């Protein structure tokens, strides 16, 4: 896999259409310029459609990974169910009830964690496990669903992999997939670019 080690961060994004009244908005808009709110600058880009994710990757000479590329990057060469191995612990990934410091159960689900957060370090007393894939990629399970590039004949839907902060741990297995229309966007959906 030759691609981004992490999900795309908000600070790296280019913004064309953003519903400014959306409560999940993590951007500021001032004098015609969008910027990530300081507390979200190192979090994954969310609220992006398949078309937006694809356009962003192509603008920089990359592409959305195919489902096979994504799965190979997450799994490596064996049949492990999770990018880091055989089992999951609460401090492996961001998912419902993982109890990470960013969880906000007063709203639906939990919030995203910073890109690469589950790297084996301690943050404010919270010990993470190194949850990188065999290829050293982070956030391949949990945090946000990631769009893939596959377009299947006679299907309008596009597919996402990896699970998110609003699913349970059983949906973080590498073979799990989700789908939506290509215009769908959500606080639980982001993307990763590949070369």
What are these regions (language model features)?
Residues 1-3, 60-61:
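Short capping motifs at secondary-structure boundaries
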Residues 187-195:
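Short, structured beta-strand segments at or near domain termini in extracellular proteins/domains
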